[in-house]
């Protein structure tokens, strides 16, 4: 969903890109990275999955190297990338791999992005339609009144300002 990716790119402080090692970086990944660049480019962490699908260690290392080099080319050299070797019979990933990702997330400091600090936006919890139902059934194309509940982030939001709701 391109609209969801765009909304996420506008508000994300840290992005975790999960990449399937069998397929590599797909078109949607590059589109999302482009959206992130336009909206301030937050911190991006890559996670490479399905490493257990490679039968030979040589093919695994080659795929890791190619994807890591492409990841660094798109983001920056040295960008953090983690590898998940495979799912255990219990349906979970290895604890040490998950701990490494959690440690990286906990120690990462978020940057103040100029786009977000100069534009106000709402992270909405819920949206309620306040228009009486009998008016909506009479004229389905009418303008409606809605209440948005959530958090205002960025700069001050002026009363009466028009909003874009995806």
Predicted stretch roles:
Residues 1-2, 10-31, 41-61:
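Conserved Switch II/interswitch segment of TRAFAC-class P-loop GTPases
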Residues 2-5, 160:
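Short secondary-structure capping/turn segments at boundaries of alpha-helices and beta-strands
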Residues 43-45, 52-140, 144-153, 159:
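Canonical P-loop GTPase G-domain recognition
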